[in-house]
């Protein structure tokens, strides 16, 4: 590969949720050419000049038309929408790590924790019953929080929760070296990290090792009054066991932003549970930003210069 051959950054864009026009205008400022799939392409024609993709949940049949693809940039923090299908194995997959997105998700988690801590679910029920009844919130010292996953977002959340006076534990699949935090890692320490917490927060990605990692066995380890918050991936939770736990007072409530199948089926029992707060995968909403456009350009030039690429995922791990 020579630098001259790949100086132009030509990007194929696909997303049913993100604005092509906004991304096109942002990328043009970085001299990056953006083309929308399938609108800007002739059917069944190959495009070797396209070297980069910017996508969310792309159809796998599109990849064959771009034989020289080198970078696939996800439009979200997760990459399972790429890895769970056939994709160009020679391409480097990049997760979106935009400070704006990370802070959005951190804010959502803080909101959720406070809703649980102040028992807002019960007030919602009281409102329907026109019941004027004051409820004593949890003592923060007795409202332990366990976070599953220790990435960028988790680190932001931990810092803010500790500043607010909450006791926080964290678990990750692989060993890290966090400071000033009760830390657990590996499958053998998962249950130890959850035991006696009042609030379980999942930031886990969807991989073969995290699929259905959370279920009744984990919920039963929590305190009597306890809550579950999921902003990671829906496939990490056994949804039927979650419904059972919520229906049988094993969990006092749940705040759910992600589900095993999205949109959430209208027949799902989760919709009818008073102790569940549902949002449609909006904890972090991707915006077209100069930060991401600049990072896309930097990563492309890093690739052709044989330098380190930022936010590259390890395909075998899934994150």
Please give the residue ranges for each predicted region.
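N-terminal glycine-/charge-rich "phosphate-binding" loop or analogous flexible N-terminal tail
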Residues: 1-50
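NAD(P)-binding Rossmann-fold cofactor-contacting core
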Residues: 163-180
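Short acidic low-complexity segments
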Residues: 36-46, 60-63, 181-196
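Phosphate/diphosphate ligand-binding glycine-rich loop within oxidoreductases
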Residues: 48-124
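C-terminal helix-to-coil terminal segments
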Residues: 2, 96-108, 122-123, 177, ...
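Rossmann-like adenosine-cofactor binding region
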Residues: 175-269
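Glycine-rich, N-terminal phosphate-binding loop of Rossmann-like dinucleotide-binding domains
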Residues: 57, 76, 203-204, 231-232, ...
């Amino acid at each position: 590969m020579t630098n001259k051959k790949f100086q132009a950054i030509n990007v194929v864009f696909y997303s049913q949720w993100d604005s092509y026009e906004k991304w096109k205008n942002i990328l043009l400022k970085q001299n990056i050419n953006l083309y929308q799939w399938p609108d800007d392409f002739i059917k069944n024609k190959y495009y070797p000049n396209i070297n980069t993709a910017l996508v969310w949940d792309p159809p796998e049949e599109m990849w064959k038309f771009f034989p020289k693809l080198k970078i696939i940039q996800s439009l979200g923090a997760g990459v399972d929408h790429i890895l769970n299908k056939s994709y160009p194995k020679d391409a480097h997959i990049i997760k979106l790590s935009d400070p704006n997105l990370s802070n959005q998700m951190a804010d959502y988690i803080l909101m959720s924790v406070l809703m649980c801590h102040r028992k807002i679910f019960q007030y919602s029920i009281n409102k329907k019953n026109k019941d004027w009844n004051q409820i004593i919130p949890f003592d923060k010292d007795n409202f332990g929080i366990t976070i599953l996953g220790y990435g960028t977002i988790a680190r932001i959340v931990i810092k803010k929760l500790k500043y607010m006076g909450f006791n926080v534990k964290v678990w990750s699949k692989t060993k890290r070296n966090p400071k000033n935090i009760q830390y657990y890692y590996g499958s053998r320490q998962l249950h130890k990290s959850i035991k006696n917490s009042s609030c379980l927060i999942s930031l886990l990605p969807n991989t073969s090792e995290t699929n259905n990692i959370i279920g009744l066995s984990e919920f039963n380890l929590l305190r009597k009054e306890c809550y579950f918050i999921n902003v990671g991936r829906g496939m990490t939770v056994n949804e039927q066991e979650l419904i059972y736990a919520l229906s049988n007072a094993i969990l006092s409530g749940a705040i759910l932003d992600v589900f095993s199948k999205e949109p959430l089926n209208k027949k799902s029992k989760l919709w009818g549970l008073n102790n569940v707060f549902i949002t449609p995968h909006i904890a972090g909403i991707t915006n077209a930003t100069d930060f991401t456009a600049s990072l896309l350009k930097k990563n492309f030039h890093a690739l052709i210069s044989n330098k380190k690429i930022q936010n590259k995922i390890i395909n075998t791990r899934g994150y």
